[in-house]
Amino acid sequence: MKTFTAKPAEVRRDWFVVDAEGKTLGRLATEIARRLRGKHKAEYTPHVDTGDYIVVINAEKIHVTGNKAAAKQYYRHTGYPGGLRSMNFEKLIDHAPERVLEIAVKGMLPKGPLGRAMHKKMKVYAGTEHPHAAQQPQALNI
């Protein structure tokens, strides 16, 4: 019996829409990362992108537990000497609510070209509107 290996041309990718309202950041991010990788499919192959497209709406209404809203820090660098900037969860969710979920999911995906390709299949929007109605995404309850 031969081991099955998925071929990139034969992979079927579906579109799903996830409502992040009232969801916990980490629990939502792990399920999204799992679906972006394709681990929920029987034909999962580690070196082939077998995952689905995920559209996340209401990213501004996501929450974290405990004191993490004030204590969790997000760092970025401007590229100049001494240019390390930090922002806590509360400020980042006000400034760029999409980035919070993007950063969380990106850290759960493989590092390298395959992980970057998987990350591109996630579309995050702060509000309820998204421009992917033509793809007819199915509602995914997480």
Curated annotation (Swiss-Prot):
Under the heading SUPFAM superfamilies, the entry gives: Ribosomal protein L13 (SSF52161)
Return the InterPro entries for the record.
Ribosomal_uL13 (IPR005822), Ribosomal_uL13_bac-type (IPR005823), Ribosomal_uL13_CS (IPR023563), Ribosomal_uL13_sf (IPR036899)
Gene3D superfamilies on file: Ribosomal protein L13 (3.90.1180.10)
Could you mention a single GO BP entry for this protein?
A: translation
Q: Which Gene Ontology MF annotations are present?
A: mRNA binding; structural constituent of ribosome
GO cellular component assignments = cytosolic large ribosomal subunit
Key words, A-Z: Ribonucleoprotein, Ribosomal protein
Query: Which Pfam families does the entry mention?
Result: Ribosomal_L13
Similarity section? Belongs to the universal ribosomal protein uL13 family.
User: What is this protein for, i.e. what is its function?
Assistant: This protein is one of the early assembly proteins of the 50S ribosomal subunit, although it is not seen to bind rRNA by itself. It is important during the early stages of 50S assembly.
Q: How does it assemble?
A: Part of the 50S ribosomal subunit.
Q: Which HAMAP family match?
A: Ribosomal_uL13 (MF_01366)
What protein does this entry describe? Large ribosomal subunit protein uL13
Its source organism is Marinomonas sp. (strain MWYL1)
